[in-house]
């Protein structure tokens, strides 16, 4: 497997061969930085080599991620240009094939094994697999979510708190590709009555993605459980500003109004929104609504 690959379709009887197809770039590259160490006559030059996992996305953008000491990509991803890739990065196909790719595959299998055990309720086996994965990549988002959900499944709030503190510092935890795990973790925090953490969790997500009505809805749920009705209502209003036809938010807001939980200074705004957008037979129950 090379860093840049191209392939031609094999000609078959009566068919012309397809044009050469260049696949997206995916592999390991390196950069070198020359540093001067010492002063005066003792000055010497050293070359520092850094390895990066490069992954070109379907839209053509290129993401780079550093490798850790265990030869797996870890930490924050950053975008680079094709010009920078060509001018500043050197391909390392043998290192990728012989060292990095096998480690990435092994890590993937370990996490998948942890997921399988967790889904079966085998929490101690799941914990072992996730712990093994985190020894290889302590910032792995899936492994951190997995072990956090495992602790919450067992009701071990103290251990879950440690994982929570790690997750809220990882920007990657709030990316679209981890949305399902993100939602599961938020729900589990609330079910385990870790409400302060749930509010901080959704607040961190909103710092990175403000324009998501589902996030505002989930934040409102957590705020309602700690009886902060003013902020709860405010997030529901913000959610409707983003999507006036979001039915779960309309139902939630209608329920708050019927229970006389909407603060006085927000009642006019809520009444106007419900009059404008809520269906005539608005459901009043918030229980059982799926988190987005």
Sequence positions of predicted segments:
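Structural marker of alpha-solenoid helical repeat scaffolds
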Residues: 136, 170-174, 208, 242, ...
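Terminal, low-structured helical/coil segments at or just beyond the last alpha-helical repeat
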Residues: 233, 237-292
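Structural signature of tandem alpha-helical TPR/SEL1-like repeats
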Residues: 121-128, 154-166, 192-204, 226-238, ...
């Amino acid at each position: 497997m090379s860093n840049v690959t191209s392939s031609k379709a094999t000609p078959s009887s009566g068919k012309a061969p397809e044009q050469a197809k260049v696949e997206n770039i995916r592999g390991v590259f390196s950069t070198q930085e020359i540093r001067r160490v010492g002063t005066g006559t003792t000055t010497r030059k050293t070359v520092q080599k850094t390895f990066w996992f490069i992954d070109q996305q379907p839209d053509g953008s290129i993401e780079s991620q550093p490798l850790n000491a265990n030869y797996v990509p870890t930490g924050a991803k950053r975008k680079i240009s094709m010009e920078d890739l060509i001018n500043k990065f050197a391909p390392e196909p043998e290192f990728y094939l012989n060292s990095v790719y096998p480690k990435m595959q092994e890590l993937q299998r370990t996490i998948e094994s942890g997921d399988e055990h967790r889904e079966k309720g085998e929490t101690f086996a799941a914990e072992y697999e996730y712990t093994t994965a985190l020894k290889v990549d302590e910032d792995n988002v899936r492994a951190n979510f997995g072990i956090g959900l495992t602790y919450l499944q067992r009701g071990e709030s103290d251990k879950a708190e440690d994982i929570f503190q790690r997750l809220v510092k990882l920007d990657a935890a709030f990316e679209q590709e981890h949305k399902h795990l993100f939602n599961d973790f938020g729900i589990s925090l609330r079910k385990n009555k870790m409400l302060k953490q749930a509010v901080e969790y959704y607040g961190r997500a909103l710092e990175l993605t403000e324009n998501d009505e589902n996030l505002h809805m989930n934040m409102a749920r957590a705020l309602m459980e700690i009886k902060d009705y003013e902020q709860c209502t405010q997030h529901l209003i913000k959610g409707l500003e983003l999507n006036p036809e979001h039915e779960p938010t309309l139902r939630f807001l209608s329920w708050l109004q019927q229970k006389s939980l909407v603060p006085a200074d927000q009642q006019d705004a809520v009444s106007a929104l419900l009059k404008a957008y809520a269906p005539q037979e608005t459901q009043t129950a918030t229980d059982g609504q799926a988190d987005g």
